Amino acid sequence: MPHRCAAQVVAGYRSTVSLVLVEHPRPEIAQITLNRPERMNSMAFDVMVPLKEALAQVSYDNSVRVVVLTGAGRGFSSGADHKSAGVVPHVENLTRPTYALRSMELLDDVILMLRRLHQPVIAAVNGPAIGGGLCLALAADIRVASSSAYFRAAGINNGLTASELGLSYLLPRAIGSSRAFEIMLTGRDVSAEEAERIGLVSRQVPDEQLLDACYAIAARMAGFSRPGIELTKRTLWSGLDAASLEAHMQAEGLGQLFVRLLTANFEEAVAARAEQRAPVFTDDT
């Protein structure tokens, strides 16, 4: 499946050996591609460090309204790379336990950056999402899978725990506790068809339609108010952590008032409907 599709590679975002690519396939859309297909885009530190850098730069690129995250070749991400883990930066003279902590923190940062990104993130899951790759997909706001994709909580198969990189937090919230327990404790594969049925992904599409389906979702979101989209993403995530309904409604209400009182977006929406045209939100008064 072609992932470059005449998109422009932004030189400023490219790592030295292009293990992470950032392209602009459509206006206001950035596509971040894990580009190590010979290792099924495994989460080696040589890939995760430039991914973290790319996310940081895209976050402050105000021309980007939506991010699409995908993998090159036939896989989304196979998770940990047991043969070529890469190099963790800034670990000189550290003992093995501290080195391990720095390694874990780096991977944790990537997951949290996806959540904190100003822009919505769509995971275009183009193939296997295994172990940490499943975690990476779950950290996105929206997931769309190709028909050939599948998902596996692989830690349990490797004699470890299946709980890593927020998986035991994110998966039950996505699909419910019983299904999450079963998938994580058995380490079985979840097909794209099943993933769609249980809500792990929003939809599955034929392989060749994956990116276009994601671009269509992204383009729709990009047409809405910037603070409206950003605050909706923020409250959706904070809702997963909310201690009470009352506290969360307060946060929602403040966000709604912020956009309603400080912009003319609502008036524009009403006028656009009356005039039977698409609204143009300026996010200003």
Swiss-Prot record:
Molecular function GO terms recorded: enoyl-CoA hydratase activity
Pfam families: ECH_1
SUPFAM superfamilies assigned: ClpP/crotonase
Membrane-spanning intervals of the chain: none
One GO-annotated biological process of the protein: fatty acid metabolic process
InterPro entries: ClpP/crotonase-like_dom_sf, Enoyl-CoA_hyd/isom_CS, Enoyl-CoA_hydra/iso, Enoyl-CoA_hydra_C
Catalytic reaction equation(s): a (3S)-3-hydroxyacyl-CoA = a (2E)-enoyl-CoA + H2O; a 4-saturated-(3S)-3-hydroxyacyl-CoA = a (3E)-enoyl-CoA + H2O
Record keywords: Fatty acid metabolism, Lipid metabolism, Lyase
EC number(s) on file: 4.2.1.17
Free-text function comment from the UniProt entry: Could possibly oxidize fatty acids using specific components.
Entry similarity comment: Belongs to the enoyl-CoA hydratase/isomerase family.
Protein name in the entry: Probable enoyl-CoA hydratase echA12
Species: Mycobacterium bovis (strain ATCC BAA-935 / AF2122/97)
Lineage: Bacteria, Bacillati, Actinomycetota, Actinomycetes, Mycobacteriales
